Amino acid sequence: TREFDLTTKQFVKDGFFRAEAKGGLSWIDRDTVYVYTDFGKGSLTSSGYPNIVKEWKRGTPMSAAKTVYEGKPGDMYIAAGHDHTPGYERDFVNRTIAFYNDELYLRGADGSLAKVDAPNSAQKGVHKDWLVLELREPYEAGGKTYKPGSLIATDFNAFMAGKRAFTTLFEPTDNSSLAGYTWTKDYLVLNVMEDVKNRLFVLKPGKMWSKVPFVGAPTIGTVGVGAVDDEDSNAVWLTATDFLTPTTLSIAELGKQPDVLKSNPVFFDGSKSVIEQHFATSKDGTKVPYFLVRPKALAFDGTAPTLLYGYGGFEISMTPGYSGGIGKGWLEKGGVYALANIRGGGEYGPRWHQAALKANRHKAYEDFAAIADDLVARKITSPKHLGTMGGSNGGLLMGNMLTQYPEKFGAIVVQVPLLDMKRYSHLLAGASWMAEYGDPDTSDWSFIRGFSPYHLFDAKKHYPATLFTTSTKDDRVHPAHARKMMALMEAAGKDVRYYENIEGGHGGAANNAQSAHMNALAYTFLWQQLAK
């Protein structure tokens, strides 16, 4: 991290500088920053993230910075920041204990820390007068119980004084969840997903929060919203996209029709395709949604080369989006594309995510297999014409499709994957994911082994053609996962291919040329296998 002067357009001589490491700098004032980084031995968590945050004055060496907070050895991440909002200037320290648990502290002028005594599992936000909690678990406060997935608000100062009078701003239903929210000068805009389709709502803060219509909200695909300036304006940026429509950027003053500013270029002809949403029935009876992009003239004879993509983890939602790579490499050539919304993701809020945690991880894989079956039942494709792709946690998903459901697929692309779940917590950032998968060094291994592809591999089984891709420079998921699995399958004489880019980090590619190469590699492999 280097300090940059926006006026002179040059790096500041002898300015704040942080060597390459996980962490960051955040401004307190012009001459003071919070710094959280690798300070040397003992300063990082077991996940490789900062465990210490310091206050650093301009003109002094980093070694002279004053420690503000030091976490415990088993913590995941420590950071701090300053709220610059006029009239609400204050400092916060955040202690991330595990992936879904953190503590927030208000830092006093004397350096003292007062805990914001909200549930560790809740996502906490402070804006001007308000404390907003996004709940992952039931929360009892002020004689009421608030549901997981709810967004609740209260006066921040009153909360710190011990009062617990919350207002429910959003409560989930069976088919809706909160995708996010953004503040403007006078309003709070909620981005709600209803069966994985975005809807925007506007709230006016006060003793009695009131709803205000969002005029002219985009109605296609995936919608994003962000404040232009939450201190001085009620304008918001709006983005809208789907599988066949490039992202459009608009600006809207709340209460007025949005003005379209620009759109990304069109990279492929989508006029011959149609977007649908279907629901598959998983093993336990759960209805699992997925999106389908298919040719309008599809024959429905089970022969269409079809690519099923998924992730299913960390409460991350898979939503429609425009991709030139998918369009040119797959759709424009007549391929069918399906995007799975399996459990483990965030499509229906915390309950959808938590349904596939740890010992229940198998439900995510059962969901994905059910979608594969549904595609066949609808006569869109058949196993020999059905391919699947996923990366990172989605690479773990692919590994389980490979080892547990090999008969359902004709080809599998496994990208930057986790595969050896006995060792994952000891490799790079792996320890930070134990809240998702469990700790393999404890009795958790009894269920983790059931979704560890490296340990599920059976040399006597037939497996579909497989392509592994990874990056030597991946600093999140170690390339050893892909390397070991490749070696195991190759030694057993399986139909397997491997490509390791020597740079690119967890994204797998360092620039557009490398990204294009990786996409071309994957789609060429899939066409070769699925169009037979």
Spans of model-derived segments:
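Active-site-proximal cap/loop segments of hydrolase catalytic domains
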Residues: I326, E332-K333, L339-K532
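Non-catalytic accessory segments flanking enzyme active sites
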Residues: N51, Y77-T96, Y100-L135, A141, ...
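The conserved beta1-alpha1 loop
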Residues: G310-G312, T470
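Beta-propeller blade signature
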Residues: R2-L6, Y49-T60, Y105-A109, P148-N157, ...
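Hydrophobic beta-strand anchors of alpha/beta hydrolase catalytic cores
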Residues: P305-Y309, Y337, T466
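Blade-edge beta-strand/turn elements of extracellular beta-propeller
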Residues: F4-R18, T60-K72, Y105-D117, A161-E171, ...
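A conserved hydrophobic secondary-structure block that centers on an alpha-helix together
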Residues: T1-G24, I28-V33, K185, L190
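A flexible loop/linker signature enriched in serine peptidases of the S9 family
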Residues: G15-A21, S26-I28, Y36-I52, P61, ...
